[in-house]
């Protein structure tokens, strides 16, 4: 491969990834910057806990510091990191190296010539993960307060097996009582990459996340930079204008809150929706962005799906119509959404 072709490949990857994360024109910045209540300082014992939970033998990026170094330095590492974390906590400003990510594209099955047919793994600074772990622990208490039982994504003692078991049980009971049931398996197109930042800050405010934590999250997302590492070298650095950070442990928490806001606005918290089980109406099961809608009639299922679609688009999330599927125990007609069947 000649130099010109290699440079063209890098340029194409940069254009594709930069376009994917380009800030939307309908996502204006409306933050007033006021912080009234400060969260308690970070304790050294919490820092030791965060260091102890880190996974070893992982590739390092950004500052180039491997996780194993913290094990070697022990208390010396705790003192230095505690000073850095405290400074971030009080000033709400993150080191720029901690806001940089390296994308490595991995081809999926099928045609490997199209950039959209790749998934990416992302390398971020190991040092930043210590502060992120502490911030995640602070966020989790608020997340557990806001999220319903039907959301099992990235939550302690819950998982996909629980949701699969729930679906099997619902189907068995529907057969036992000879009731029709309609499932809609929703698939979003690049859900984590499309979230509007300022929409996210508004949602965090509405669910009463402390301003201090929201400011830390906002400043982490603002000014993000990324590069794509290809087989022909790395691209220039470019700005990330939307979506949550890939490879960041905070991203699933933030997406769950974002998705919960959408589902509430779609009316999924209404008592009359869904199917009735043990005096309770169940209308959806979720694992992060993977959502199943449930109804006892086809018309109600269509209506619920259109509400979710409409509210999702208000939040810059688009349904992948091609990958959204319907499963029914009774008769069903052909559905068309946006001209697609």
Spans of model-derived segments:
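Short, conserved micro-motifs composed of acidic
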Residues: 34, 232, 318-341
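Surface-exposed loop/turn segments and immediately adjacent short secondary-structure elements
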Residues: 1-117, 122, 126-130, 147
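Hydrophobic (often cysteine-bearing) scaffold residues that line and stabilize catalytic clefts
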Residues: 9, 13, 62, 66, ...
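Conserved polymerase palm-domain catalytic core
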Residues: 188-288, 295-304, 324-328
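Short helix-interrupting loop/turn segments at helix-coil junctions
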Residues: 19-28, 57-62, 79, 91-97, ...
